[in-house]
Amino acid sequence: LEHLAPGGIFCQWLPLHQLEVGDLEAIVSTFTAVFPHVQLWVAYHRSLTPLAALVGSASPIAADADAMRARLRDPTFLAMARGVGMDDPDDLGVLYVTDGDRLRPVVRDVPWITDDRPRIEFSAPRGYFHQEGLGRDALAWVAARLDPAPAPIAGARPATFEARANLLRAQLALLAGDGPAELRAYLDALAAAPASPAARAALAAIAAERRRAGDVSTADGITRVLGSPVRASE
């Protein structure tokens, strides 16, 4: 913590597909003990290798969608943002999960990772050989921490936050190999936030996959939904 510049932040990437839930809890417990201000974010862009990130700072962490929109007018920054699928500030808003105040009670009794007790050094390699359900279980733990309140991002459109739970549900369905459930969850996300870039991109990708597989009817149905008002799936 003392190595950060004033207002500086530290980001710890979490490869959920390589972490058992116990290891994830140990990391969160240690991180929230060190940093007074913490946020948990997740990436769920239809990936079989889901990622999360813990962001910590000595001072409150602020995100500003309007500032990001201004930076997106810079062609260099825009190209970089598009490279990671983040060319809309609302892409950022739907990735927010929760803050340290909500995480600390969950991991209060979980031992810290320390230099003399480097738990992850010994437990993480086990995941390499026992990967079934690994990413799904860790992502489910993260999803259970979802704060129902809008993400603390100034200038972001509140409606997009309503899609977060459904986007996580879709990612969990993908990891479980449940295509129909994944599709329903993305349709529900789009119904909650029709402008959601994440939901629209995922549905467009699913439509392309279904078309390549010869399921033209489903592909056409998704394409029609993307071009019309959307209702939640039944």
Predicted feature descriptions by range:
Residues L1-G7:
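A short glycine-rich, Lys/Arg-flanked "PGG" loop and its adjoining helix->strand segment in the class I
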Residues G7-L14:
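Conserved beta-strand signature within the Rossmann-like core of class I S-adenosyl-L-methionine
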Residues G22-V42:
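Conserved Class I S-adenosyl-L-methionine
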Residues L40-D188, A193-A198:
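Soluble small-group transferase modules, centered on the S-adenosyl donor enzyme superfamily
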Residues R169, L203-I206:
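Structural register within alpha-helical repeat arrays
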Residues A173, A207-R210:
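Residue at a conserved register position within TPR or TPR-like alpha-solenoid repeats
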Residues A193, R210, P229-V230:
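Alpha-helical junction/boundary sensor with strong preference for TPR arrays
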